[in-house]
Regions:
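Flexible, surface-exposed loop/linker segments and immediately adjacent secondary-structure boundaries
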Residues: 89, 93-136
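An acidic-aromatic
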Residues: 55-107, 175
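Cleavable N-terminal signal peptides
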Residues: 2-3, 13
Length: 182
């Protein structure tokens, strides 16, 4: 009886991994994507969320742009390990390695878009739930410094599309980004 229970647990763990593998394989096939986004940042110090909207553009394997259109124009452009922020007439540049707390969150989105399961598992404890048609990744930071700031990142989607990204901070603040085709 115990052997049967262990065998069935192994089979369900295999099925979950197979589905995660399938989702990652589908995501990896996409070489370009462009979606509209609406982001709401819920901060303890504010009564209402801070809202922004714009366009996300992804080009495999490591180019990601977040172009905010409202309330103010702003661009965050990630090429490889180089992050460029454009606000008005000012441009800021940094390497992701300069701020080890920023890199995991950028990489959580970029590595998911790239279908890079191994890269995600180097930085996060990855938990997959759902089916190919409706799935969710729960990413818990492995690095203690990062985990003191962010408790988890939740990414939800269907097949090869990411539909939402939630970042839950340990202090109760959270960011919710909803994605939809343009």
């Amino acid at each position: 009886m115990l052997a049967w229970a262990l065998l069935s647990m192994s089979a369900s763990a295999f099925a979950a991994n197979a589905t995660l593998d399938q989702v990652m394989a589908l995501l990896a096939q996409r070489k370009h994507g462009e979606v509209k986004y609406v982001e709401e940042d819920y901060l303890k110090m504010l009564d209402q969320p801070v809202k922004s909207s714009g366009v996300l553009v992804y080009d495999a394997p490591d180019h990601l742009e977040k172009r905010a259109l409202k309330p103010k124009a702003e661009s965050l452009i990630l090429d490889g390990e180089r992050l460029t922020v454009e606000r008005g007439r000012r441009t800021y540049r940094m390497d992701l390695g300069e701020d080890p707390q920023v890199a995991p969150f950028v990489d959580s989105i970029r590595d998911t878009l790239a279908g890079n399961e191994q890269a995600l598992e180097r930085v996060f404890k990855v938990t997959f739930t759902g089916t190919l048609e409706e799935w969710q990744l729960k990413l818990v930071p492995l690095d203690e410094k990062v985990a003191r700031k962010v408790s988890e990142v939740q990414i939800a989607g269907a097949r090869d599309e990411i539909q939402s990204v939630k970042i839950l901070e340990t202090d109760g603040d959270r960011s919710v980004m909803t994605l939809e085709p343009p």
